[in-house]
Curated annotation (Swiss-Prot):
The gene is murA. This is UDP-N-acetylglucosamine 1-carboxyvinyltransferase. The keyword Cytoplasm applies. Transmembrane segments: none annotated. It comes from Sulfurimonas denitrificans (strain ATCC 33889 / DSM 1251) (Thiomicrospira denitrificans (strain ATCC 33889 / DSM 1251)). One of its GO terms (cellular component) is cytoplasm.
Amino acid sequence: MDYLQIKKSPKLHGEIKISGAKNAALPLIAMSILAKNIVTIKNLPHVADIKTLLKLLSNLGAECSSSWENYSTTINTSTLNQTKATYDIVKTMRASILVLGPILARFGHCEVSLPGGCAIGQRPIDLHLKALEQMGAVINIEAGYIHAIAPDGLKGCNIIFDKITVTGTANIVMAAALAKGVTTITNAAREPEVVQLCEILNASGVKIEGIETAVLTIHGTGGELLEIAPFSVIPDRIEAGTYLCAGAITKSELTLKGANAKHLGAVLSKLEEMGSKFTITDDSITIHPSKIIKHVKIVTQEYPAFPTDMQAQFLALATQADGTSIIEERLFENRFMHVSELQRMGADISLNGNVATVNGHSKLSGTDVMATDLRASSALVLAGLVADGITDVHRIYHLDRGYDSLEKKLQNVGADISRLKE
């Protein structure tokens, strides 16, 4: 098993190329189930979760041909001959549930194992299932599997999500794409990753109204498969945010190429509050960090507010701030598991329920730490960049699920970081 070894780094400098967004690519790969043609996806991030979902489609009978050197894949789902997504793959990644809506819409029946993935609290899929039942599906859960059938096909209806769900919105949008009639989703997620899915479906013959709003109206094709043109995955806003935090915590000027600042409004705003300034172009962001990092108050909420996937990185940054920062996590329980590891490095953090109080000017010391989930992994790496001594981050399979070549990208801008074998 691999681990990352990090030594306190001098100022970083240079450019980092931002990869395609994992959280956009996953539903777009699942979307290929709705296609009648071979789908070409470009700017695909080279991360474990993408490989897992492509393997799942291959197990269902799809022909997937990936060129990782070119960050692209082609998917032919005309050869699909299975409708059962088995536990051995689904257990490793919650996003596998994204195949539920498309398979059910295309074939009228499917079995999908209940999902696994990051251990950051309960992320129930009941909202997905309730919506599919409203569309005419009959669903039972037996022996760890979701059994879904739609004997008369899925039918459009009015769906109101009790709470905003990104994966749920994507799943139901894909199901509605092939349904009969019109589906309206109220309280839909507005994340850029959902927006891209809707835009591509819209360009593929599925009329979707209300894109970028909380109310989506999807005019289904009545079972007619889609002609999907080649497309490129949007840049990863969480990866970009992570490297911006690397610049801020090491007080280094970095340029992110291929980043979309329009997707990073809340992150850039909080970094500005903490003293950083930015030069922004259509496809790049350069951070000009402050010599003094200011304290901050952060509340995680759904897009376009501050993303929960950036909470851990900002918590690491706040350990070096001037003053006391307050970080409140409103979306997931158990998403402060990185706190105990940062405390082992010397961070002065106290927890009260879903609120972390971070006292700045912590003198961090390198030690052995364990990653507990994907974004916690990156927070420990950020801390390691400014900690005295050597920091060894273990269980980085979490990191590899969502970051493409993180240690290589940091090495290229001067960080002292290496991937080693246990």
